[in-house]
Amino acid sequence: MGLTIDDQLAIQQLAARYNHAIDSGDSAAFAGAFVDDGVLDAGQLQVEGRTALEQFGQQFHTSARAPRHVATNLVIDGHGDKATLQAYVQMYALAGDPPRQEITASGKYTDTLAKVDGNWRFVRRTFTVDA
């Protein structure tokens, strides 16, 4: 059996809350979007485990000026307590002088997820930069 509508909506909410958490500097919520041994894979950057993810969230927020992650075209598949998510993403941040919002990264998320204790979490979130 495929995912229920409730599961699909919960996964969409997870993706949205992840973006809000990383953009607002809520590193605990950012890390909480992952399973305990979850992995953020951004090519040469590999972050694994809740503590490392939380530290990354703190570092990212202090280095980016007014970041905004925008994910679109979400495609969710799966069954039971396992799922995959694919989405396009653009990141905006203040840049230049005078500062203005600019696209600073563009690419694709390819994710594996698991439902743990009734809540969906990222097992692995892979970000591939557009070439």
Please give the residue ranges for each predicted region:
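Short beta-strand edge/turn micro-motifs at domain boundaries
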Residues: 84, 106-131
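Short, conserved clusters of charged catalytic residues that mark active-site
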Residues: 13, 71, 108
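Short, cysteine-centered beta-strand-loop-beta hairpins and adjacent loop/turn segments enriched
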Residues: 92-102
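A generic structural micro-feature
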Residues: 65-68, 101-105
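Charge-dense, low-complexity intrinsically disordered segments
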Residues: 5, 47, 100
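Short, low-complexity N-terminal intrinsically disordered segments enriched in polar/charged residues
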Residues: 1-28, 32-36
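A solvent-exposed, acidic/Ser-Thr-rich amphipathic alpha-helical stretch
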Residues: 27-91
